[in-house]
A protein has these predicted regions:
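Core catalytic region of metal-dependent phosphoesterases/phosphodiesterases
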Residues: 1-80, 173, 177-185, 189-190, ...
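Catalytic metal-binding/acid-base residues of hydrolase active sites
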Residues: 13-14, 42-45, 91-92, 162-164, ...
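Short glycine-/acidic-enriched loop or helix-start segments at secondary-structure transitions
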Residues: 18-20, 47-50, 97, 166-169, ...
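Active-site-proximal loop/helix segment associated with metal-binding centers of metalloenzymes
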Residues: 67, 81-174
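Short loop/helix-cap segments at secondary-structure boundaries that form the rim of catalytic
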Residues: 78-80, 204-211
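Proline-aspartate-enriched helix->loop->beta-strand connector
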Residues: 154-159, 192-198
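Short, electropositive alpha-helical surface patch
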Residues: 174-178, 208-214
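Charge-rich, low-complexity terminal tails
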Residues: 180, 195-208
């Protein structure tokens, strides 16, 4: 079919806060002759994602944003025409040194304006930041179980951030190891894979022969 062409995005698509602009983008994507698959980044609207029903696609859990716009959920292994893919979205935001503001705080506007004047990096809870950007232990365990069932062998891995050792090569001093990059390092050490695709670091290059930053 025309939608047999698959396009993969390694997170950070900004899905999908409520606005006319976002609705236009969703409708535009739904009319394209391809299927867009993506893993969550650290700037998705996780409140909205939580409202989406969970379905099944090629052996793993997914959420359909549109018929051809598919969120690949954390820790899932998918099999497509003999190709095995492991997906694990999420990343820790690095642009929050100024803090996370609570919009219900009586002093919110004063704090917001002060941080803006100072040029600080900050975000607003449930508006531009969600704690669900980082996985919980249940998601880590689900990934391990699914990889165990796959014999720790896949063709491709798609994530938003990457394993700690790869991040050290790719990201510079701005990005420090955390529980997710350490988990992905565990995956990197145990899993046999052909290529690992990831985003998050705002560059496009081969970090190693097998690890590709997009």
């Amino acid at each position: 079919s025309a939608r047999g062409t698959l396009v993969m995005v390694g997170g950070g698509v900004g899905c999908w806060y409520v606005s006319k602009e976002q609705e236009w983008h969703r409708e535009w994507l739904s009319g394209q002759p391809f299927t867009l698959r993506w893993v969550a980044g650290n700037h998705e609207d996780y409140d909205m994602l939580a409202e989406r029903p969970v379905g099944e696609w090629h052996g793993g859990k997914v959420q359909y944003i549109k018929e051809n716009v598919i969120h690949l959920m954390r820790g899932q292994v998918y099999e497509l025409d003999g190709i095995r893919l492991f997906a694990f979205g999420g990343a820790r935001s690095h642009d929050i040194h100024g803090g996370i503001l609570d919009p219900d705080d009586p002093d919110f506007r004063k704090k917001y304006q002060a941080l803006r004047r100072a040029g600080a990096w900050f975000r607003v809870n449930h508006v531009s930041w969600w704690k669900e950007e980082m996985p919980d232990e249940a998601e880590f365990e689900e990934g391990r179980r699914n990889l165990e069932r796959a014999g720790w062998q896949v063709d491709f891995i798609v994530t938003h951030c990457t394993a700690s050792s790869t991040q050290a090569l790719a990201g510079g001093i701005l990005y420090q190891p955390d529980t997710l990059t350490d988990y992905l390092e565990e995956i990197r050490q145990k899993c046999q894979y052909r290529k690992w695709f990831f985003g998050h670091y705002h560059d496009n290059r081969n970090v190693t022969e097998k690890d590709l930053m997009l």
